[in-house]
Swiss-Prot record:
Stretches annotated zinc finger (RING-type): 33-78
UniProt name for this protein: General negative regulator of transcription subunit 4
Zinc finger (C3H1-type) stretch: 229-256
CDD domains per UniProt: mRING-HC-C4C4_CNOT4, RRM_CNOT4
Organism: Saccharomyces cerevisiae (strain ATCC 204508 / S288c) (Baker's yeast)
Glycyl lysine isopeptide (Lys-Gly) (interchain with G-Cter in ubiquitin) cross-link, renumbered residues: 270
Every RRM domain range: 137-228
Length: 587
C-alpha cells in the first residue's frame, strides 16, 4: 500500500500541473534518467522500482542497491528499495513494434536536423572561400636571392645568417622566380635576377613582427627587400565542416578577425584607388641576357621589378654596391629611403633593440600573392633576349615626359585656391603669420635728430607732465564770441540758457581770482565787473537758489522774463558785449 504522505504529494503535483498548458510539450521528446542523464530505452521506460512512481534506469537502480553509501533508498520518497515492490510492464508485440518505430523516427529526425545544421554552417562559410586573411605569424619576403642553388635556398634562409636569427621557423616555402644554372653564368643570373618570393612561418607573432621591422625596406646586394605579413585562406575541409586530414595544413581552421580579412572585390577596389592616386605603375618582368655597357648606364632610370604594383625607390639609389659573389658570405643590408605611404599592417616595434628598422610600407603591399597561389606554381618566366639602347632611351624619355606632365598638373592643382574658402584662407593666414614670426629678424630703428628744432620741440606738450606748459595771460575771448554768435541768431530763445551758463562760469572765475597773482592789470577788475553786471538778473525776478536751473525750471523763468522788458534786456546785453560798456535803459 502506498504511503499516504507520498500519495498526497503526488496529488498536489498533479493538481499543480493541471493549471499549466502542457500542449507545447511533445510526446516524442526523449526521456532521460534523472540521475545519470542518459537516454532511457524501452525496458527502462517500463521499469518502476518504487511504488511512488519515480522512474530511474536499471543501472542507477543497481548502483543504489549495491552502494552502501546510498542506503538503498528511493531518491524521491526515501523509501527502502525492495525487490517485491519492483514492477515491470510487459509490452505486447504491437506495442514493442510501435515503440521501435517511434525510436527510429526520432533518430531519423535527429540526423536530418544535424544535416541541416551542417548545411547552414557551410552556407555561412561559403563566402569565406574567396576571403584572404592576414596571418600575423606568416611573413612574405620578395627580392631576396642568396647565391645558392634552388634546392639549398630554403635551408639557407632558415639558418642563423638569414631569417633564423629572428625566432623559431616552422616552415619555409620558396616561390622560384628565375632558374639558377650550375654553369659559369650563374653569377650573372644571380646579379640581375629579381629574386625569390619566400613565405616564412614563424613560431610566434612577435618574431614575425620583428623580422618585418628589420628586413623591410633594406637593400641586400644592391636589391630592395620588401617584407610584409602574408595572407592565407580558409581550409576547404573547414569550410565543409569536416576535419582536415592534413596534419601539416597551413590554412586557417578557425574564424579569423574581420579587421584582417578582405575579399577579391575589396582588393580590386584598393588597387584601383592606389592606381588613381599614385599614377601608373611600371613593372618589368623577366631578366636580361645580353646587356651592353651603354644600355646598363641608361637603365639606371628604369624601375626594378615590384611585386606590389608601385614604383620602387631602388631606381633613385645610384650608390648601391654590387659586390662580387664568388663566395656565399653573409649579405650586406643597406638601409633604404623611407617610401611614401603608411603602415597598413599595424606592425608594432618590440622591446628588443633592432638595427636598420624601416616600418613604413607601401600602401599596396596588400597585393602580395597568397601562400595558396604560390604552392605548386613554381613556373619559370620567359626571358628577354636583347634590349637595345634605342628602346631604352625611348622608354626613359616617355617616362620622364609622363612624370613632367603629372608634376605640372599637380603644381597647377596646388596653386589654385578657392577665394571663398574661409577656413582655408584662415589657415593660410595663420601659417603666414607663424612663418614670419618664426623667421623674425631684428632690425635696428633710429630716429633722426634734425627733424625738428629745439624751439618747436619745447612747444610740444609733455606726455606725462605739465611743467613745460606756460600759462597764457591773454584771453582769446572765445566765450564772448560764442555768446555773440548765439544771440545774433536767436537772442530771445537762448537768454535763459546763457544766463545759466554764465552763472556756472562765475563760480570758476571767482576761484581763479583767488589763485592768480595779486598784481593784475587795471583792465582785469573792469572786465570782471563787466561780467558780473552781465549776469545780474532783472530786479523784478527773484534769484533762485543754485541747482534749480534744470530743464523743468526753464519754462517759468523764461515766462517771467518775457515781459515788456525782454527785448530791451537782450539788446542791452548785446550792445554791452559788442561795445564793452553798459547802457542803462530808462524805465
Amino acid at each position: 500500500m502506498m504511503n499516504p504522505h507520498v500519495q498526497e504529494n503526488l496529488q498536489a503535483i498533479h493538481n499543480a500541473l493541471s493549471n499549466f498548458d502542457t500542449s507545447f510539450l511533445s510526446e516524442d521528446e526523449e526521456d532521460y534518467c534523472p540521475l545519470c542523464i542518459e537516454p532511457m530505452d524501452i525496458t527502462d521506460k517500463n521499469f518502476f522500482p518504487c511504488p511512488c512512481g519515480y522512474q530511474i534506469c536499471q543501472f542507477c537502480y543497481n548502483n543504489i542497491r549495491q552502494n552502501p553509501e546510498l542506503n538503498g533508498r528511493c531518491p524521491a520518497c526515501r523509501r527502502k528499495y525492495d525487490d517485491e515492490n519492483v514492477r515491470y510492464v510487459t509490452l505486447s508485440p504491437e506495442e514493442l513494434k510501435m515503440e521501435r518505430a517511434k525510436l527510429a523516427r526520432k533518430e531519423k529526425e535527429r540526423k536530418h536536423r544535424e544535416k541541416e545544421r551542417k548545411e547552414n554552417e557551410y552556407t555561412n562559410r561559403k563566402h569565406l572561400s574567396g576571403t584572404r586573411v592576414i596571418q600575423k605569424n606568416l611573413v612574405y619576403v620578395v627580392g631576396i636571392n642568396p647565391p645558392v642553388p634552388y634546392e639549398e635556398v630554403a635551408p639557407t634562409l632558415k639558418s642563423e645568417k638569414y631569417f633564423g636569427q629572428y625566432g623559431k621557423i616552422n616552415k619555409i616555402v620558396v616561390n622560384r622566380k628565375t632558374p639558377h644554372s650550375n654553369n659559369t653564368t650563374s653569377e650573372h643570373y644571380h646579379h640581375h635576377s629579381p629574386g625569390y618570393g619566400v613565405y616564412i612561418t614563424f613560431g610566434s607573432k612577435d618574431d614575425a613582427a620583428r623580422c618585418i621591422a628589420q628586413v623591410d625596406g633594406t637593400y641586400m646586394d644592391g636589391r630592395l627587400i620588401k617584407a610584409a605579413y602574408g595572407t592565407t585562406k580558409y581550409c576547404s575541409s573547414y569550410l565543409r565542416g569536416l576535419p582536415c586530414p592534413n596534419p601539416n595544413c597551413m590554412f586557417l581552421h578557425e574564424p579569423g578577425e574581420e579587421a584582417d580579412s578582405f575579399n577579391k572585390r575589396e582588393l580590386h577596389n584598393k588597387q584601383q584607388a592606389q592606381q588613381q592616386s599614385g599614377g601608373t605603375a611600371f613593372t618589368r618582368s623577366g631578366i636580361h641576357n645580353n646587356i651592353s655597357t651603354s644600355t646598363a648606364g641608361s637603365n639606371t632610370n628604369l624601375l626594378s621589378e615590384n611585386f606590389t604594383g608601385t614604383p620602387s625607390p631602388a631606381a633613385m639609389r645610384a650608390q648601391l654596391h654590387h659586390d662580387s659573389h664568388t663566395n656565399a658570405g653573409t649579405p650586406v643590408l643597406t638601409p633604404a629611403p623611407v617610401p611614401a605611404g603608411s603602415n597598413p599592417w599595424g606592425v608594432t616595434q618590440s622591446a628588443t633593440p633592432v638595427t636598420s628598422i624601416n616600418l613604413s610600407k607601401n600602401s599596396s603591399s596588400i597585393n602580395l600573392p597568397t601562400l595558396n597561389d604560390s604552392l605548386g606554381h613554381h613556373t619559370t618566366p620567359t626571358t628577354e633576349n636583347t634590349i637595345t639602347s634605342t628602346t631604352t632611351t625611348t622608354n626613359t624619355n616617355a617616362t620622364s615626359h609622363s612624370h613632367g606632365s603629372k608634376k605640372k598638373q599637380s603644381l597647377a592643382a596646388e596653386e589654385y585656391k578657392d577665394p571663398y574658402d574661409a577656413l582655408g584662407n584662415a589657415v593660410d593666414f595663420l601659417d603666414a603669420r607663424l612663418h614670419s614670426l618664426s623667421n623674425y629678424q631684428k632690425r635696428p630703428i633710429s630716429i633722426k635728430s634734425n627733424i625738428i628744432d629745439e624751439e618747436t620741440y619745447k612747444k610740444y606738450p609733455s606726455l606725462f607732465s605739465w611743467d613745460k606748459i606756460e600759462a597764457s595771460k591773454k584771453s582769446d575771448n572765445t566765450l564772448a564770441n560764442k555768446l555773440v554768435e548765439i544771440l545774433a541768431i536767436k537772442p530771445i530763445d537762448y537768454t535763459a540758457s546763457v544766463v545759466q551758463f554764465l552763472q556756472s562760469v562765475n563760480v570758476g572765475v571767482n576761484d581763479n581770482i583767488t589763485i592768480t597773482d595779486n598784481t593784475k592789470t587795471p583792465t582785469q577788475p573792469i572786465r570782471l565787473q563787466t561780467v558780473s553786471q552781465q549776469i545780474q538778473p532783472p530786479l523784478n525776478v527773484s534769484t533762485p537758489p543754485p541747482g534749480i536751473f534744470g530743464p523743468q525750471h526753464k519754462v517759468p523763468i523764461q515766462q517771467q522774463q518775457m515781459g515788456d522788458t525782454s527785448s530791451r534786456n537782450s539788446s542791452d546785453l548785446l550792445n554791452q558785449l559788442i561795445n564793452g560798456r553798459k547802457i542803462i535803459a530808462g524805465n
